[in-house]
């Protein structure tokens, strides 16, 4: 009986590995039609008796403001161009901080956030974190940095039912994602840690302060010229 169970488990693991690899490869070229986070938000709205309409319009890389690209990197993952999906020093610092009893602090890279938002459910279990690590590794292996950031910008949550840069730009500022200014981009990046609680178009004092910090970080990174560092040559 035990050998049979082991064989079935092995087959299930092989099937999962193969199917997840195929899915990641497909999304290397094909825009994801939606994300696990979008499904989760839709289900939550039904359960709460407050159904929402999801706003999301996919925009290719060239139709998204370079200011927003740099703002998101400045605010969320300044080592994005150089790491392979995991920022080990940041993870170690977050673990040490959490062990000291502070508020739980994350250290997710943009790649990890793409893996989580695209494929997984919310939660902090080790099982989910293991799946996140698996998808993060696959994404870094098969996608270019430009593709990772493109999918992130088209999948990130920027308000109740608002997903992606185009929907966010229209919802908060009444412009297309390609026409976002540096200040608008910084305000959008500033609310990413808590996009339901905070508003990019009506920033609190904290969000305004964080947006100012992000603008300074953008300048230190070199502004839009920083995007030239996103290496596409190391990808398969």
UniProtKB/Swiss-Prot annotation:
Coiled coil stretches, renumbered: none
Membrane-spanning ranges: 12-31
Gene3D superfamilies, A to Z: Biosynthetic peptidoglycan transglycosylase-like
Pathway assigned to this chain's UniProt record: Cell wall biogenesis; peptidoglycan biosynthesis
UniProt cross-references to Pfam families, sorted A to Z: Transgly
Record's subcellular location: Cell inner membrane
Catalytic EC class: transferase
Record EC number: 2.4.99.28
Family: Belongs to the glycosyltransferase 51 family.
Role played: Peptidoglycan polymerase that catalyzes glycan chain elongation from lipid-linked precursors.
HAMAP family: PGT_MtgA
Protein name, as recorded: Biosynthetic peptidoglycan transglycosylase
Annotated source species: Pseudomonas putida (strain GB-1)
Lineage start: Bacteria, Pseudomonadati, Pseudomonadota, Gammaproteobacteria, Pseudomonadales
Gene: mtgA
């Amino acid at each position: 009986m035990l050998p049979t169970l082991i064989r079935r488990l092995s087959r299930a693991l092989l099937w999962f590995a193969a199917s997840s690899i195929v899915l990641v490869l497909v999304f290397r070229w094909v825009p994801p039609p939606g994300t696990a986070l979008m499904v989760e938000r839709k289900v939550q709205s039904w359960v709460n008796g407050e159904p929402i309409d999801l706003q999301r319009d996919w925009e290719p890389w060239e139709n998204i403001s370079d200011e927003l690209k740099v703002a998101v990197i400045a605010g969320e993952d300044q080592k994005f161009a150089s790491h392979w999906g995991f920022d080990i020093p940041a993870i170690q610092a977050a673990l040490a901080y959490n062990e000291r009893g502070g508020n739980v602090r994350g250290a997710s890279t943009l790649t990890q956030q793409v893996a989580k938002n695209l494929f997984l459910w919310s939660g902090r279990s080790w099982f989910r974190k293991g799946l996140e690590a698996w998808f993060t590794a696959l994404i870094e292996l098969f996608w270019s940095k430009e593709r990772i950031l493109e999918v992130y910008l088209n999948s990130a949550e920027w308000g109740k039912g608002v997903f992606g840069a185009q929907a966010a730009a229209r919802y908060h500022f009444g412009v297309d994602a390609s026409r976002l200014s540096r200040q608008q981009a910084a305000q959008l990046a500033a609310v990413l840690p808590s996009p339901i609680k905070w508003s990019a178009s009506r920033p609190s004092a904290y969000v305004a302060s964080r947006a100012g910090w992000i603008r300074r970080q953008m300048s230190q990174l070199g502004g839009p010229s920083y995007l030239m560092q996103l290496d596409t040559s190391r990808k398969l």
